[in-house]
From Swiss-Prot:
The protein's assembly and partners: Component of the eukaryotic translation initiation factor 3 (eIF-3) complex.
Family stated for the protein in its record: Belongs to the eIF-3 subunit H family.
InterPro entries cross-referenced by the UniProt entry: eIF3h, eIF3h_C, JAMM/MPN+_dom, JAMM_MPN+_peptidase_M67A, MPN
Subcellular location: Cytoplasm
Entry's Gene Ontology BP terms: formation of cytoplasmic translation initiation complex
Annotated MPN domain residues: 14-166
Lineage: Eukaryota, Fungi, Dikarya, Ascomycota, Pezizomycotina
GO annotations of cellular component type: eukaryotic 43S preinitiation complex; eukaryotic 48S preinitiation complex; eukaryotic translation initiation factor 3 complex
Origin superkingdom: Eukaryota
CDD domains xref list: MPN_eIF3h
Name of this protein: Eukaryotic translation initiation factor 3 subunit H
GO MF term (any one): translation initiation factor activity
């Protein structure tokens, strides 16, 4: 009864132990820029998915001598597909059995993967998460750790699940315009992001608070009176200085803009392919319509001659209508464009004001 009640409560957050975060960061950084994947274990508690341990999947070594330039991409593709490979499924089961023997949470609650520059929304992510989420214990998540973003000083760890609408569409494998319009499925409905809470045990928290802090070796020069404090008033945040006008563009921002342009080009390529399909379909439908009109006229003539009418469904054998290409790739690319746009918007927030200030100083004054 408790399990049934817990499944009725939807997942609303993910709680990750700090040790698990360190394991994921270390595993992803060790294989960078090759994709790293692994399994996470834990338990579900009243809608909060508690992740208590993790372990990486075995990696595929690529020869460094006489290697092809595409070997790196091949290794990344193999690593990205690792969570659903048969060998790693067996490896995961054996690891969970060993964890159970040492009284560690042995419930698989998903998997993790590394990302570079926010580029993680692809078919591998969808297939891996669908592989985990379609199982009887579907309360699983995908943790995405952006190594390059974390190198800038802020941890980038996000949790995603496939939305129920997308799960139903992916099971049918029919991503046509008609089906997407019926289900009202858009690129925004592919993934559902859950908030992450980094958790420490009470024992570890107490230990951190009890750690001694090194005392300063030099005496601090405190002001002797309020008069000294007033004479040395620190500058306000808006105090004029040259550093605040620095327009240095983050290399991460430049690379993100380049990848955004590549994704936009891919979007136009997908759009041109779909428009080509529509033109082909229109031409074939025009031929079918003309053939039907001709056959109807022939049957009318044969009816006046008291002859048997000719079949009107022969067009299915004579003409072959083109098959509509899957719109899944276009949806994933649109979702990736949105991801890049959010990253660019976050980076340019602090630069836009400076650029407008420089522009106003460069333009001639208007009387």
């Amino acid at each position: 009864m408790a399990d049934i009640a817990s499944k009725e409560v939807p997942l609303h957050s993910v709680q990750v132990e700090a040790l698990v975060v360190m394991k994921i960061v270390k595993a992803c950084a060790a294989t960078y820029p090759t994709t790293a994947t692994g399994s996470i274990v834990g338990m579900d508690s009243n809608g909060t998915l508690q992740i208590t341990n993790s372990f990486p999947f075995p990696t595929t070594d690529v020869a460094t001598s006489d290697s092809h330039p595409n070997d790196h991409m091949a290794a990344s593709n193999i690593a990205a597909a690792a969570p659903r490979s048969k060998a790693n499924v067996i490896y995961q089961s054996e690891m969970i059995k060993m964890l159970k023997e040492v009284n560690v949470d042995a419930n698989n609650v998903g998997w993790y993967t590394s990302a570079n520059m926010g580029n993680f929304i692809n078919t591998s992510l969808i297939e891996n998460q669908f592989f985990y989420q379609k199982e009887p214990n579907e309360r699983t998540v995908a943790l995405v750790h952006d190594v390059s973003r974390s190198a800038q000083g802020a941890l980038s760890l996000r949790a995603f699940r496939l939305s129920p609408t997308f799960m139903a569409a992916y099971k049918e494998s029919k991503f046509t315009t008609e089906n997407m319009q019926k289900s009202k499925l858009t690129y925004k409905d592919i993934l559902v992001e859950l908030p992450i809470i980094v958790h420490n045990s009470h024992l570890l928290t107490s230990f951190l608070h009890q750690m001694p802090v090194e005392l300063p070796k030099k005496d601090l020069d405190f002001p002797a009176s309020f008069a000294d404090l007033n004479r040395n008033t620190p500058p306000t945040p808006l105090y004029p200085n040259m550093e605040s006008l620095d327009l240095s563009i983050d290399p991460y921002l430049e690379r993100t803009c380049d990848m955004l342009l590549d994704s936009i080009e891919t979007h136009y390529t997908e759009l041109n392919n779909f428009q080509y399909f529509q033109r082909q379909l229109t031409r074939e439908q025009a031929k079918v319509t003309a053939w039907k009109a001709k056959r109807t006229a022939e049957n009318a003539t044969r009816a006046t001659q008291k002859l048997a009418p000719l079949p009107e469904d022969e067009w299915e054998r004579l003409f072959k209508l083109p098959t509509e290409p899957s719109r899944l790739e276009g949806m994933l690319n649109a979702r990736q464009v949105e991801q890049y746009s959010r990253q660019v918007d976050g980076f340019t927030a602090s630069i836009t004001g400076k650029m407008f200030a420089v522009k106003s100083n460069l333009l001639p004054e208007q009387n």
